[in-house]
Protein backbone atom coordinates (compact mmCIF):
# COMPACT_ATOMS: atom_id res chain seq x y z
CA UNK A 1 0.00 0.00 0.00
CA UNK A 2 1.41 3.42 -0.85
CA UNK A 3 1.95 5.81 2.04
CA UNK A 4 0.13 8.61 0.25
CA UNK A 5 -2.43 8.55 -2.53
CA UNK A 6 -3.04 11.63 -4.69
CA UNK A 7 -6.31 11.68 -6.61
CA UNK A 8 -6.88 14.39 -9.23
CA UNK A 9 -10.45 14.46 -10.54
CA UNK A 10 -10.88 10.70 -10.07
CA UNK A 11 -13.76 8.54 -11.24
CA UNK A 12 -14.80 7.08 -7.90
CA UNK A 13 -18.03 5.44 -9.09
CA UNK A 14 -17.82 4.16 -12.66
CA UNK A 15 -21.58 3.56 -12.79
CA UNK A 16 -22.17 7.34 -12.75
CA UNK A 17 -25.44 6.67 -10.90
CA UNK A 18 -25.22 9.64 -8.55
CA UNK A 19 -28.16 11.85 -9.62
CA UNK A 20 -26.22 14.94 -8.54
CA UNK A 21 -23.68 14.24 -11.29
CA UNK A 22 -26.24 15.11 -13.99
CA UNK A 23 -26.72 18.55 -12.43
CA UNK A 24 -22.97 19.19 -12.40
CA UNK A 25 -22.56 17.83 -15.91
CA UNK A 26 -24.41 20.89 -17.20
CA UNK A 27 -21.63 23.13 -15.84
CA UNK A 28 -18.70 20.90 -16.78
CA UNK A 29 -17.16 22.00 -20.10
CA UNK A 30 -14.92 18.94 -20.32
CA UNK A 31 -16.55 15.81 -18.96
CA UNK A 32 -19.89 14.34 -20.00
CA UNK A 33 -21.39 11.31 -18.31
CA UNK A 34 -22.34 9.36 -21.43
CA UNK A 35 -18.93 9.71 -23.07
CA UNK A 36 -17.14 8.99 -19.80
CA UNK A 37 -19.23 5.91 -19.14
CA UNK A 38 -18.52 4.62 -22.64
CA UNK A 39 -14.76 4.96 -22.11
CA UNK A 40 -14.95 3.41 -18.65
CA UNK A 41 -16.88 0.44 -20.09
CA UNK A 42 -14.14 -0.08 -22.69
CA UNK A 43 -11.48 0.09 -19.99
CA UNK A 44 -13.40 -2.23 -17.65
CA UNK A 45 -13.76 -5.05 -20.15
CA UNK A 46 -15.50 -7.88 -18.29
CA UNK A 47 -15.16 -6.21 -14.89
CA UNK A 48 -18.53 -4.94 -13.63
CA UNK A 49 -18.65 -1.16 -13.30
CA UNK A 50 -19.70 -1.40 -9.66
CA UNK A 51 -16.69 -3.57 -8.80
CA UNK A 52 -14.31 -1.78 -6.43
CA UNK A 53 -11.56 -1.97 -9.07
CA UNK A 54 -13.64 0.31 -11.26
CA UNK A 55 -15.54 2.12 -8.51
CA UNK A 56 -13.19 2.59 -5.55
CA UNK A 57 -16.05 3.97 -3.44
CA UNK A 58 -17.42 0.42 -3.34
CA UNK A 59 -14.23 -1.07 -1.95
CA UNK A 60 -12.78 -1.53 1.50
CA UNK A 61 -11.17 1.78 2.43
CA UNK A 62 -9.50 0.48 5.59
CA UNK A 63 -5.74 0.45 5.47
CA UNK A 64 -5.39 3.07 2.76
CA UNK A 65 -2.54 5.54 3.12
CA UNK A 66 -3.09 9.27 3.46
CA UNK A 67 -5.25 10.57 0.64
CA UNK A 68 -5.13 13.92 -1.09
CA UNK A 69 -8.17 14.45 -3.28
CA UNK A 70 -8.72 17.43 -5.54
CA UNK A 71 -11.62 18.03 -7.87
CA UNK A 72 -13.19 21.10 -9.45
CA UNK A 73 -16.50 22.27 -8.01
CA UNK A 74 -17.81 22.69 -11.56
CA UNK A 75 -17.14 19.16 -12.70
CA UNK A 76 -19.33 16.12 -13.12
CA UNK A 77 -17.23 14.13 -10.65
CA UNK A 78 -17.56 16.65 -7.79
CA UNK A 79 -20.61 15.06 -6.07
CA UNK A 80 -18.89 11.67 -5.81
CA UNK A 81 -15.71 13.31 -4.52
CA UNK A 82 -17.68 15.01 -1.74
CA UNK A 83 -19.40 11.72 -0.92
CA UNK A 84 -16.03 9.92 -0.88
CA UNK A 85 -14.58 12.55 1.46
CA UNK A 86 -17.52 12.00 3.83
CA UNK A 87 -16.95 8.24 3.66
CA UNK A 88 -13.29 8.75 4.58
CA UNK A 89 -14.30 11.00 7.49
CA UNK A 90 -16.76 8.39 8.78
CA UNK A 91 -14.01 5.76 8.75
CA UNK A 92 -11.40 8.10 10.29
CA UNK A 93 -9.14 7.79 7.27
CA UNK A 94 -6.68 10.66 7.05
CA UNK A 95 -7.21 12.71 3.96
CA UNK A 96 -7.20 16.19 2.56
CA UNK A 97 -10.00 17.32 0.29
CA UNK A 98 -8.97 20.25 -1.93
CA UNK A 99 -11.89 21.60 -3.94
CA UNK A 100 -10.99 23.73 -6.92
CA UNK A 101 -13.63 26.43 -6.54
CA UNK A 102 -15.41 27.22 -9.81
CA UNK A 103 -12.91 25.01 -11.63
CA UNK A 104 -13.27 22.20 -14.13
CA UNK A 105 -12.11 18.61 -14.64
CA UNK A 106 -8.36 18.02 -14.13
CA UNK A 107 -7.77 21.74 -13.53
CA UNK A 108 -4.25 21.19 -12.06
CA UNK A 109 -3.04 20.14 -15.51
CA UNK A 110 -3.77 23.54 -17.05
CA UNK A 111 -1.56 26.66 -16.92
CA UNK A 112 -3.78 28.63 -14.54
CA UNK A 113 -2.96 30.21 -11.14
CA UNK A 114 -4.91 27.54 -9.27
CA UNK A 115 -2.58 24.93 -10.70
CA UNK A 116 0.40 26.54 -9.03
CA UNK A 117 -1.40 26.74 -5.69
CA UNK A 118 -2.33 23.06 -5.87
CA UNK A 119 1.20 22.05 -6.86
CA UNK A 120 2.62 24.02 -3.92
CA UNK A 121 0.23 22.21 -1.57
CA UNK A 122 1.17 18.88 -3.13
CA UNK A 123 4.89 19.62 -2.80
CA UNK A 124 4.43 20.44 0.88
CA UNK A 125 2.58 17.17 1.40
CA UNK A 126 5.28 15.18 -0.37
CA UNK A 127 8.22 16.91 1.33
CA UNK A 128 6.79 17.04 4.85
CA UNK A 129 4.59 13.94 4.57
CA UNK A 130 1.85 15.91 6.32
CA UNK A 131 -1.74 16.55 5.38
Set out the residue ranges of the language-model regions.
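Alpha/beta-hydrolase superfamily serine-hydrolase fold, recognizing
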Residues: 1-131
Amino acid sequence: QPGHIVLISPVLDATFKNPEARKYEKEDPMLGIDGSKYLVELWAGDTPLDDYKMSPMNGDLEGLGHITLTVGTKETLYPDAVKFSHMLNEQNIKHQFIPGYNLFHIYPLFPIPERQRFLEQLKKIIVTKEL
